[in-house]
Amino acid sequence: MKVKKETINVWGARVHNLKDVDVTIPRNSLTVITGLSGSGKSSLAFDTIYAEGQRRYIETFSAYARNFLGNIERPDVDKITGLSPVISIEQKTTNKNPRSTVGTTTEIYDYLRLLYARAGTAYSYLSGEKMVKYTEEQVLEMILDQYIDHRIFILAPLVRQRKGHYRELFESMRRKGYLYIRVNGEIKEIERGMKVDRYKNHNIDKLKVRGKDDERLKKSVQIAMRQGDGTLMIFDEHDNSIKNYSKRLMDPTTGLSYGEPAPNIFSFNSPEGACPRCKGLGVVNEIDINKVIPDDKLSIRDGAISPLGKYKNQMVFWQIDAILQKYDCNLKTPVCDVPQEAMDEILYGTMENLKIPKEVVHTSSDYFVTFDGIIKYLRDIMDNDDTSAGQKWAEQFLATNVCPECHGFRLKRESLSYKIGDRNISEVANLDLNELAEWLSNMAEGLSTNQKIIASEIIKELRTRVGFLLNVGLDYLSLNRQSATLSGGESQRIRLATQIGTRLVNVLYILDEPSIGLHQRDNQRLINSLKELRDLGNTVIVVEHDEDMMRAADWIIDIGPKAGRKGGQVVFQGTPEEMLHRDTITANYLNGIQSIQIPAQRRRPNGKAMVLHGCTGNNLKNVDVEFPLGVLTVVTGVSGSGKSTLVNETLQPILAHHFYRALKKPMPYSSIEGLEYLDKVVTVDQSPIGRTPRSNPATYTGVFSDIRTLFVGLPEAKIRGYKPGRFSFNVKGGRCETCGGNGYKTIEMNFMPDVMVPCETCHGKRYNRETLEVRYKGKSIADVLDMTIGQAVEFFENVPSILPKIKTLQDVGLDYIKLGQSSTTLSGGESQRVKLATELAKRDTGKTLYILDEPTTGLHFEDIRILMNVIEKLVDKGNTVIIIEHNLDVIKLADYIIDMGPEGGRNGGRVLVTGTPEQVADCKLGYTSKYLKLALAK
């Protein structure tokens, strides 16, 4: 292959399943890498190209610095040339810190803080009046103008609401020649030995009578300003009125003063700005009585008070019984029948000495004790228990509520009292980005000439950065939205917008499915943003399955032909136009030779339905919605329209609590009907099936237990007396003790990255020699774990206890992954299909509800076809499936559609139209109908 300076060249890539792959990627182009799930796309883009770019960057550091940067292994590749500095933008919500928001991540909030510090107008949080500040000259002029022929006193505030006798202060003032002092509003003559009550709060002001000439008045003002820390007060004897004057921002009526505004007083991550009650989080954790007493129909003896359980801690129950006896109740009385006064004492405690009879405690006399209450008991555990298990146990009884002091705005009262127009900084941060863009366009009208000059550059930067976010389809988000609540696709697009804002050039960007979670309406805006990144002088590589993205690319690399061991080859690289004339699975879907077929006849609902009333969570507008049962329902709508709020945050928690007593609270709703038609709910999301390398598809699906049972029943195992634990790599006995059942050892290299090498004893097989000697059909337990799902289906075809569970993994298109493959190496889409296969293998009654959130994430056209065939089988058995989805290939297969909108954020939250795909396509409401009509016409 001839080396060209204008290309990135990869020779002999063998990472994971790649088979000595050679590729050429044009520089300053938009390149899409596509192919089936598991074909090797991410192995090429992230584990080869990005990993090598990172390794070369790290190599420029000193050996000492490299020691702190973790393990950067050289990818298994012969050679890569033409690499630029590389930045990876993956589809992960990496920041779980509740202090991280869209505003802080994009740095837009930093500019907003600067804007309010430089152009905000301060108001008093006591009176609502505009805060003012004066120079000494201005104060002097106002005194001369307003107090002509008035007898006035000039006061310097010395003490404000502090305790003490202040004898030394009074004596110091007397020695300096001052005759009067104002104490708690009363003017007094200073006397020798004068003092006040040391245990009360006092206000003390030094007082000077106005002189007869202006020079003495000027000097008095200067002294008062200096000793009052920039503040003085004028007491007019004519009408006994007091006015406040200050060099600092001050409320002239109440005397309340603020410091000079600085950006950090608008930061909820700074002590200067954060609300003192919630420490800048906007929420506080409080004990939820509904979690402490989940079922008030039970008696206390039967476990009504959840933290106490049933009759265990005798002393506590004796104390509670003593309280109940006062109200003619006992431990067997249902909580709903216990008077509220008694429950208050049980929950919050009582200082009354409770009598516990000597017959109960088996002592010579009655026992008297006070009771602190259940709430204090829980608080003590949370505050004082050193064990994480104890604190975690107590936290299950907490509820997160809006902070009562800042009302969720996160900032101090002073910080919230600065306004531009009629909005404080938190109100602006709560606007969705469309509204924020409009506010930035109009806000300058209310600024003074000086403020406009100061703010112009800041406003320009803000408008530019907000514009980047709008261009990637995030108009429904607000700056205050927590980063932890964003989907992977949203997080990725935020990072993309941030990178466009940096205006870097000659950089290689690698993105992982940026179209995830994006409605067709916003696809073109995303593509334009990627082209803008390219046009700045960068190379953009996108791992993607989206048809529009492929057609818009400058270059396509198709990895295949299939997945796993049957993939890992470049089946095509070239332009989109050239690809249309090739015979690959991807090309056949693009040119229309293959397609996901629309069903000839759609299912009709079984006449039963689940109906939700009055949903008002997040942006939902008092939504009433019907979910017909026995059909495939797809919930659609633009990003931010309320789909996840309706299904994942309202419906799913209601069902989880109903069937499994789950504690997660649903979003607000009025009522629900139709639960009696279901017997369970299954939520299949894309979270990992395990977070350690020891977790794998075999352990998650439960088939590993069946495989171990099979091995235990073999003659050789019986002779040796082996039990199922012998074939587990997690416990001592059968595992290799050299590596602890990991199959590898970690070698510390001091000033070099740690190296993971196969265990020299078991050679990566995880088990000891004796265990591996037990074989079934010539294969050891380690050999079985190393099989792909496809191989395992053939191997266990005559074992009815094992085959069904493995066959369902094959049915969902996972025949290429290994039975013992570490869960940490599975993609989100693969993890979701492992979960789906696990549920498929279980016996169902035809009354199960399955909820899936964007199951097509990471899936190729062919993968979607296989997945939907499996889902169709579930529905054919009488079950109900609800899917949140943007992919038109899924939407067109629905029996029933619920389309939400019309926009995202505040302008969404309504059910626009419901019905079959044909009915929705014929409707002119919303954006989904337009694109669905085109999909149905293909």
Model-derived segments and their meaning:
Residues 1-938:
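Conserved phosphate-binding elements of NTP-dependent enzyme cores
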